[in-house]
């Protein structure tokens, strides 16, 4: 990680080789309501992964009448990628028609990221929170009802896990987690790079 050789969790001193302490989770979540029906949400987080990044990837559905559907080329998904950490920015990944005769396409990326000058003048997230705290502004803080709902969700998952003998696949430090977690993602996109 960052050019250094590091141990995975189970290789650490004072950690049992058969430890089942949760250090990684990957999942496909769905929300059972009208607005989000049929929209999968994928999450992946863990210790000692390839990189520390936080991003939201919106993968657009294919339209039924796609002009470029019947080509020999396998088209990439159209994506909106919102990078939250470490490099704030946004990019739109599209299949664009090549500027030639025919219907061939090529992947293009439209990106925006803050300039180095803007980054230098931007306060850290914690600075904003501390300032809000001093002002008594609770807008950006988690309220009890939100926290309670979050724990209700997490507790339901934890309860299911305790009912089954754990068989967690291990993973090497500096990777994106176990191979099994990558199988959740059904199409190639920047999120797996």
Regions found by a protein language model. Give the residues of each.
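Secretory/organelle targeting and membrane-embedding segments
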Residues: 1-187
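A short, hydrophobic C-terminal helix/tail in secreted or cell-surface proteins
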Residues: 188-193
